[in-house]
Amino acid sequence: MKTKGRLLLYINYAKYAIKACFKIIINHIKDIREEINVKSFSKYKYNFLFEFIGSFIFVFLISVYMLNSNQNEEYIIKHLNQINPYKKNDIFINEVNIHNNDINGSEDIRNASGIKNINSINDVKMYEARALLNQGNKQLKEQNDTIFEKNKINNTEKIENSISEEKEQTIPNTNEDSTTIVNDNKREEDEVTNIGEKNDKINEAAYIISLPKDSNKEKLTKDIDEVIFKDKVNEYSKIKLDDINNMDLKKFDDIKILKDSSNKNNSNHAIYSFFGCLIYVLFIILGAHINPAYTYALWLIEPQKYGFVITTLYATFQYIGGILASILCAHIYGSIFIYSLLPRKHIMKTFLCEFVSTFLLTILLLSFYNYKKLFKEENQNEEEFSFNKEKIKNMSSLYSSHSFEDIYEYDIFSTYSTNSTNNNKYKKLFIYFDNKYIKYIINHIFYLLFIFFSLLFFVFVTNTTLNPMFSTSTLCTYLYFKYVQSNNSFNFFSIFFSFLSLGKIIQIIIFYIKSLPLWIGPYAGSACATFFMKLFKDNNEEIVNVIDTNVYSHNRTKEKMPLINTNNMNHNAYLEEYNDHICYNSNNYLNYKIF
């Protein structure tokens, strides 16, 4: 009876959880439908276009810079399993060279059991022993030749100076002595080599005891047939761009691509990180988001202002711009850039780096957003440029030298203050430019610099992307290379039918599951940052009843009648000015006030 009671209790809990989730989904869909009915999306078209252009330029410039700087460098394939170095199409990395060569990410070659590749190491030892033996034989032969020449000279002198038969018989005796010396040297050489071979066998026996039964099987790399190897066995195998592009997607997890240690001075990671962060901050000044994680963070912190549909459209245009830019760069320059952001082996480490970095960066951006909002509220009553329409009508010519003064009611190059204070004394600056946007940049320069150096630290030190749009663009470009450009022709139907293959579908699913931390980490970090900011948010904001009149109905006389009773919602007080500004000032869509 107790077990049945517990089972019924768990069933009731499950039903309650399902009903709660279903209710949340229904309410969310209802809000989306109301937003679609109420919102006029045409007024956001310039914002969507700006997000598309900003994302395209951001990804395009960084990709071009990195691809163009690294396209002539040699890269290295490192196989993660034990490999026989003397087989064709295999790649071998000697244990000694791993520690001597300064290459990031190099590790000892170990199999699944954690045991070193003893067969390969023994082969290298035998190779080195043979080289030493050949060198010793060469020195011994030279020594024997010198002894033989000395004996020959002594024998000829004795033949010329002596006539007796006893002296003539000494010649073969000396030859016998020389041959005995040579035989003794060879005997000593054989003894040394036998001792060395015995020691090697003893050492090999000590290793072989701990080996498993399947360690004698050879593991070949059959999917890298076009790799051009160097002559020396104990060096990394260097490859070019075309060899990387010809790899098989199925076996890609078995290898690791590294940069040659001799070319490490040509690495421009710090330069393009600085360049990318600078572009990002410049677009933040212009008012773009460029980061879907930050866009959804703004929606979470103020859902009434942005709306789920508007936020999704923002992110969609960001993704489209980034993907097109990445594919265009890969089509022009190659695909080296793709392999720098492929899924990492350490999933949790990647997720934590992306999560923590995006969490801290989103807090900075949201603080910057709140500071912008306060700046707008504090400066909303200041005088701006006033456009005098009456003077334009009375102007004789638009090409007048005083056209600016006629339009804006004062001269931009005036040395007097526009306000009648201190009897219009001269200002310190010779050019007085009363523009709130310049004031906005000057007042926010500290935040912008702080965000810039924070971005530079996260990208350069932790090697994280901080942007799911950037990671998704890279992955889509990788698939473009594998399934489109490999055929040297673009045929939509052939590409579509090639994706219907069950094997390719499974490969893509596995590939994207492994790369989930590249975009789940930023989204999770930004979501936690919004909840953290809401803990310190003032909930006592002024709420007014605002009627959204973006949707109208027409009567028989073709008069516009607002749907007053249909779309009635509560907004924050400052949103009334926001909606009026965006509706009646269409020429200022890209102004910072909108964001």
From Swiss-Prot:
State the annotated membrane topology for this chain: Multi-pass membrane protein
MF terms in GO: water channel activity
- Return the Gene3D superfamilies for the record: Glycerol uptake facilitator protein (1.20.1080.10)
Q: Where in the cell is it found?
A: Endomembrane system
Q: Provide the catalytic activity annotation.
A: H2O(in) = H2O(out); glycerol(in) = glycerol(out)
The membrane spanning regions, by residue number, are 47-69, 270-298, 308-333, 344-369, 435-462, 514-536
Function of the protein: Required for sporozoite development in the mosquito vector. Required for parasite transmission to the mammalian host.
The protein, known as:
Aquaporin-2
Organism per entry: Plasmodium berghei (strain Anka)
Lineage per the UniProt record: Eukaryota, Sar, Alveolata, Apicomplexa, Aconoidasida
